[in-house]
Amino acid sequence: MNLRVKHWIYGIFCLLVAIIAIGPELHVASNAHPKKAVVESQVKEKPTQEKEIDNSESHMRTPIDWHKSSETVPYPDLNKVKDFWIKVDLKNNRTYLYDGSKVIYTMYSTGGIYKKDPKTGKLKSVTPTGTFYAQQERGDSFFNQSLKEGANYYVSWKNHGEYLFHSVPTKADGKYNEQEAAKLGKTQGSHGCIRLSVPDAQWMEKNLPVGTKIEIVG
């Protein structure tokens, strides 16, 4: 066998060795890229999901300000709402405006204080619970001499003027009771009515249709 043939055979042998050595790496690389793509896709999708969660509560005004509306977006146009009703959550200090099963606006609120029920021994709010309906009695202001307390922008939902939605309370001089107003959306404090921020109460007085269903829980 001459020298040229030996070199030719040696070259073929080296080429085969190289192909055998590189083959597994090519296989691993081809399998690695799809997995990497899936991981990268999951990483990219995760911030989108977190953003959607954040947006669900992004309209609530923080910190709570009883001088302003509870949300930073406009109040709902009730002319476009098909099934309007209200739910008041006494324990969580929130009033929810609904269109069917969908919450369309949330208001910070303060309901009645909790007292021990002599029959059950359990704490119970002085605000009645159950299903009620908005009544025609409403106005820009009132003052209760016996309680030495008043409020602005009220609308009745029980006993025709006894239980109301209204603003945070006012004192005898007509000024807002800032100590009581600071409880809005944080804790209970009323004598049975539902307190709202000043703009929220004003919207209720002007826009709440007579006969609107109001469910109060807590």
Named regions from a protein language model:
Residues 1-3:
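N-terminal secretory signal peptides that target proteins for export/translocation
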Residues 5-17, 26-33, 146-218:
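Exported/periplasmic cell-wall-interacting domains
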Residues 24-83:
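N-terminal, intrinsically disordered, polar/charged segments of Gram-positive cell-envelope systems
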Residues 40-42, 49-52, 135-136, 145, ...:
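Residue-identity detector for glutamine
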Residues 62-174:
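Gly/Pro-biased beta-strand-loop elements
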